[in-house]
């Protein structure tokens, strides 16, 4: 039987016999870890050896267990390994010798509490820290964006937000497990939430040539504004006061506007876009350096200036290659006190990593759970992490970070534990040819399934692979853009009960729908086979894919049956009033019957808000969907008086639940303009620029305006 250990130790040598009896840990220095009882039959003995070649070693014989470690954290790592063995074997441990050491010293995950603003749930974060300790993590990055309780911005708070007391308590808890909490804020881009309030309108960047700042919107702060610099200085002072971490991550990624306003434009003309950006972060770095902190910054805006990298290829219109030498002088100033976080979520990124290696810059390679693009996690993301981290190791990265993003519409970080754990396993073990040096991805998945949920078979893995892998039988029938997040959005984001049919019907024609229905039945069967050995109040989130697909099968089936009856009614309308009315009655009844199919989705959405602190919009949208189902049924019944020819479902989807936008007119719009007030609709044009080139004649020639 394989040892289900995550991460897998460097060497495990099995011995003869078993150690029988309940282990206990008498030393109070480690009682706070809550890994072992303080009383039992067999005492866990440990000793320190600062000259030990590895981080720790464990010896289990028929007579007892002994641990040797370099320091306290080494003993903790050994105890977490021993804890996992006891979880698997109980009070009959097989004899063995374990020697272990980490490949990388910076082993991190990021949890996103900003971006749609997740309420703080103390119990979940306590479990998070414990799980991270079991996986031998060193750093927890908390991504606040601007959703942080700044004392300097007392007006900018929200209910449910982490308080400073919450943060202090979490830092203290993490410290007992030798985990450093790193704050992640944004001091330039990704400030759209902050800038959506009129009180902050003067803080934004804008394009002087194309925008009026009184009416324009930007998600970027102005780099030269005195108000911005004073605010950012106060923010950084507060963060430095509260967090012991030697790294403060200040964002800096995906900046939509830089150097376009009157304050910034002169410097952009002289130094270029990159120069304005780098000079601003030179200022930020100076603030942090004064406080003895290192600046963490996302790497994409810096990498734009490198012609070989992917960011340059995508955004070369923003680059100033002629100013590369000048830009690099500032980068070199930042060298000793800055860590560049090089993010890429789809696999290898050798070119960007070579940029940092070539210039002697400190960098951390960042992958992602990728769950924000999915309905269920793809277990194959472990291969993408491996591809990124293996070249990062080769090129001297400080370590690795697996990120979690955008927790909303039924998604929470809890759903991303497999890719979070696989990233930490790769960090500890180091990268082998295909996955970790010490085990394959399949071996990791089986071990983590057991350690996280007590599941000894492959039932959970089979369910998640079927639900989330892009090439699975369940998803491969749909085009890529409709396989991931789109499924989740169809249930928890759209409120139009016809949208799924409009988008997915090309791929569900004929027998294709029955095939999809059978695949969803298989998904249900796979979920039913999951043998959860212990109660876990958070496990329910793994059911999201099944809940979504079941609801969508029912939706498509009932809408399609209703459309069949509606079509019969349309054909009978000119000559058979009885058949006409009957068809509409049956169609409306079928549509209304879909309401009960959304009960489980509604319960799931409410539970996510209660347990994980997710925003409540999925509940609100589902409530509106239920109303729109009634609205659709009522509208169909209102047509029984024959006051107009029946519009197609496509036109109903367009007019009944939203306002169509069109440059001139929307086909069929005249009937909707004369409808009953409950259903009256008309198209609009909120972007009244010409739909085609304009030309007019002068006395001598035609002048064409593009």
Language model segments and positions:
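Substrate-binding groove of N-acetylhexosamine-processing glycoside hydrolases
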Residues: 2-35, 169-172, 178, 226-237, ...
